[in-house]
Amino acid sequence: MRTIKEKKEHPRLRKTARTKKVTHRKLSSGPVCLLCFQEPGDPEKLGEFLQKDNLCVHYFCLILSSKLPQKGQPNRGLHGFMPEDIKKEAARASRKVCFVCKRKGAAIRCQKDQCVQNFHLPCGQERGCLSQFFGEYKSYCGKHRPTQNIHQRSFGESCVLCCEDLSRASVENIRSPCCSQAIYHRKCIQKYAHTSAKHFFKCPQCNNREEFPQEMLRMGIHIPDRDAAWELEPGAFSELYQRYQHCDAPICLYEQGRDSFEDEGRWRLILCATCGSHGTHRDCSSLRPNSKKWECNECLPASTEDSVSENLGDTPCCSSTFCPHEPFLRATSLEENPGSSWTNWLQPSLLEKPESSSGSSCQSWRSKGIKVTKDCKKSK
């Protein structure tokens, strides 16, 4: 009898051990998210890892949780999510099983009607689920997610951003709405959106700022509402506040060297008035004691050409051929042209019938400064 009981107990032990293996989570040495039980991970996929009062959670897990309200102001709690509400949501999610990993704690549910799929955010991303970061922040399983019409022949092409081959899985590729031939990797577009942010995010090919961001939001791309990443780097524009401090004259006469100067006087450093990236001491370029304007050799030819073109206006280069001593006047309307042209001097009757012209025409010709021929005198 003892052997029969032992045989009956062994399967039970094996069964309980198997169930413990499924429900038991891998222990982590560091903090984990309360809503997905994952470590900080990639901020482009899971968002910023927030910690406050022994409460750790991913930013994307907060805003995508199905039943978590945002009751506070943005400066309270974790971006407006109160700690007590987060704990209540974690307690509710502890009764929901993820359809991917078969573990409890799934706080995100598919928003399609009559769909009961629940999942953790990292698990859903691996299985093709999609989350939208606008409006009601809806999430969908792989069966009900928004899709695009990407032709099968496009899979042999390359991504416009990374120039590598496109993935065979259509959920990992995104087609541009404004440039229909352009297809990107989802991870490339997400990295581009995370770097450029809302104010600089546009189509990489045609610079579309309206249709392109809207389609990317629909397809689950997170576009942060902040300045671009290159503007948030500490000291990114520090060189713009540095003044040029070097004498670039062919021969520097200052005893202390080219990198030294005085605030006033002969050895004051004068910067180029056009570019500001070259300088000289007053005495090194033979400037007047009170002069404050100087131009380097690189900017001087350009400024000289600009001044010449402004003085000449619309004067053509061949004006000296017509009149070497007087400025050339274009044949425009009478209001613009103060002088009379040759066609205005000749009357229509004289041009058509010269023999019928009277002596008054010769008088008018003399008044215009034109010599009268002998034929005209005879007719007079």
From Swiss-Prot:
GO annotation, cellular component aspect: cytosol; Golgi apparatus; nuclear speck; nucleus; plasma membrane
Stretches with biased composition (Basic residues): 10-23
InterPro entries named among the record's database cross-references: EPHD (IPR034732), PHD-type_Zinc_Finger (IPR051188), PHF7/G2E3_ePHD (IPR042013), PHF7/G2E3_PHD (IPR042012), Znf_FYVE_PHD (IPR011011), Znf_PHD (IPR001965), Znf_RING (IPR001841), Znf_RING/FYVE/PHD (IPR013083)
Site (Cleavage): N149, I150
Localisation per UniProt entry: Nucleus
CDD domains, A to Z: ePHD_PHF7_G2E3_like (cd15669), PHD_PHF7_G2E3_like (cd15496)
C2HC pre-PHD-type ZnF: 30-68
Binding-site list for Zn(2+) 2: C98, C101, H120, C123
Binding annotation for Zn(2+) 5: C178, C179, C203, C206
Zinc finger (RING-type): 159-207
Annotated spans, Required for association with and ubiquitination of H3: 243-300
Pathways involved: Protein modification; protein ubiquitination
Keywords annotated in UniProt: Metal-binding, Nucleus, Transferase, Ubl conjugation pathway, Zinc, Zinc-finger
Domain of life assignment: Eukaryota
Binding locations of Zn(2+) 3: C110, C115, C141, H144
First and last residues of each zinc finger (PHD-type): 96-145
Any one GO BP annotation for this protein: negative regulation of osteoclast proliferation
Subunit comment: Interacts with MEF2C; the interaction promotes MEF2C binding to its transcription targets. Interacts with GATA4; the interaction promotes GATA4 binding to its transcription targets. Interacts with UBE2D2; the interaction inhibits cleavage of PHF7 and promotes association of the complex with the nucleosome core particle.
Domain commentary: The extended PHD (ePHD) domain is required for interaction with the nucleosome core particle via binding to DNA.
Name listed for the protein in its UniProt record: E3 ubiquitin-protein ligase PHF7
Lineage: Eukaryota, Metazoa, Chordata, Craniata, Vertebrata
Gene name of the record: PHD finger protein 7
